[in-house]
A protein has these predicted regions:
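Catalytic nucleophile-loop/oxyanion-hole region of alpha/beta-hydrolase
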Residues: 94-95, 101-102, 114-152, 275
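Short beta-strand element of the alpha/beta-hydrolase
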Residues: 78-89
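N-terminal cap/lid segment of alpha/beta-hydrolase-fold proteins
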Residues: 36-76
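Short beta-strand/loop motif that positions the catalytic acidic residue
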Residues: 208, 214-216
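C-terminal catalytic histidine-bearing segment of alpha/beta-hydrolase fold enzymes
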Residues: 239-293
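N-terminal Sec-pathway targeting helices
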Residues: 3-21
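Primarily recognizes the serine-hydrolase "nucleophile elbow" in alpha/beta-hydrolase
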Residues: 136-198
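Conserved alpha/beta-hydrolase "acid-adjacent" motif
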Residues: 221-227
C-alpha cells in the first residue's frame, strides 16, 4: 500500500497543478471580459454634443425621469412616432448606440423616432421597471403629440433582442390601459413570460393588440422562441408577419452602425451583415407604411 500511495502522489500533484492553472486562467478571462464589458458600456455613451439626436428627459410624477433621444425629420404634416429600443440582454446596452440608425430611419421612413435609454436590470433595478419606463415614455409623447408634430394614433414600438421583449411587454401593458399601439416590430426578441401575460388578458384585449412584425436572425434560438408569441397572436386574430434573414446573426440590425466600431463586442458586424441590416430596415419601413396608411 505504501508503494501505491507513493505512485499516486505525482499524479495527484499534476492534476492539482492543472486545476490550479485552469482556475487562474478562468479568473483572468473573467476579469478581462468584465473589463471589456465595462469599457464597452462606457464607450456606448455619447455626449450631447456628439449625439445626432436631441437628448432630454421625460418627466414622471414620483419616479425618476426617463432618458431619451429624439429624432424629428422635416415634415409639414403630423407623422407617426417610432419608439426604438436597444438590446443588451437586459443588463447592457445604451440608446446612444442607435443614434446613427435612428437618424437614418427617421429620414427614410418619414417618422419621428424616440430611443428610450431604459434602466438596465442590475443594482436592484428590475426588468419590469424598464418596461414601465417605455410605457411612460409612450404616454408622454402621446399627451404631447402636438408639441412634437406626431400623430398619437400612429404609435409604433420597435425593439431588438431584450428591446424586443420590452416592445412586446410595453405593447401589452398599454393595451391594458386602453392605449392603442398601431404596430409592434420584434427583432429577434426575448420571449420571457409574454405568452402567459397575453393569455391572461381578456379576450377583447387579446384581439385588439397591435399588428406585429417578427424579424428573425438565422439559427438563433432567441428568434425562434419569439414565434410562440406570434402563434398565439395569430390564433387570436391579430395580424402578424414573419421575416427571417438567412445567414444573419443575432444583433445584426443595430450592431451594423458606426457606434459599434469601437466596441469589443460586435460579433455580427461585417459588410455582409450590414447589407442584411439595411434590407431589414427597408422591409420594416415598408411594412409600417402599409400598416399605418
Amino acid at each position: 500500500m505504501e508503494k501505491t500511495k507513493r505512485r499516486r502522489h505525482p499524479v495527484l500533484k499534476t492534476i492539482g497543478i492543472i486545476f490550479l492553472v485552469l482556475a487562474v486562467a478562468l479568473v483572468v478571462t473573467l476579469i478581462r471580459n468584465g473589463k471589456r464589458s465595462a469599457e464597452d458600456q462606457a464607450a456606448m455613451v455619447k455626449t450631447d454634443e456628439e449625439l445626432i439626436g436631441t437628448h432630454f428627459y421625460v418627466p414622471r410624477d414620483g419616479k425618476d425621469d426617463v432618458d431619451v433621444n429624439l429624432y424629428l425629420p422635416d415634415s409639414a404634416e403630423t407623422m407617426p412616432v417610432v419608439f426604438n429600443l436597444h438590446g443588451g440582454a437586459f443588463i447592457a446596452g445604451d440608446a446612444d448606440t442607435l443614434d446613427t440608425q435612428s437618424d437614418r430611419i427617421a429620414k427614410e421612413w418619414g417618422m419621428a423616432v424616440v430611443t428610450v435609454n431604459y434602466k438596465l436590470a442590475k443594482d436592484g433595478i428590475t426588468i419590469q421597471y424598464a418596461v414601465d419606463e417605455v410605457v411612460d415614455t409612450v404616454l408622454y409623447f402621446r399627451e404631447h403629440a402636438a408639441e412634437y408634430n406626431i400623430d398619437p394614433n400612429k404609435i409604433v414600438i420597435l425593439g431588438y433582442s431584450a428591446g424586443g421583449y420590452h416592445t412586446m411587454a410595453a405593447t401589452l401593458e398599454l393595451e391594458k390601459q386602453g392605449v392603442d399601439v398601431a404596430a409592434q416590430v420584434i427583432c429577434y426578441g426575448f420571449i420571457k413570460e409574454v405568452v402567459e401575460t397575453y393569455n391572461a388578458m381578456p379576450e377583447a384585449q387579446r384581439q385588439a393588440v397591435a399588428p406585429a412584425l417578427f424579424i428573425l436572425a438565422d439559427n438563433d434560438p432567441i428568434s425562434d422562441g419569439s414565434l410562440k408569441y406570434e402563434e398565439v397572436l395569430r390564433q387570436n386574430g391579430v395580424a402578424t408577419e414573419v421575416k427571417k434573414y438567412e445567414g444573419s446573426m443575432h444583433g445584426f440590425i443595430e450592431e451594423n452602425n458606426p457606434e459599434y466600431e469601437k466596441l469589443h463586442s460586435k460579433a455580427s458586424k461585417s459588410p455582409e451583415q450590414e447589407v442584411l441590416a439595411r434590407d431589414a430596415e427597408d422591409y420594416i419601413g415598408n411594412w409600417l407604411k402599409g400598416i399605418l396608411k
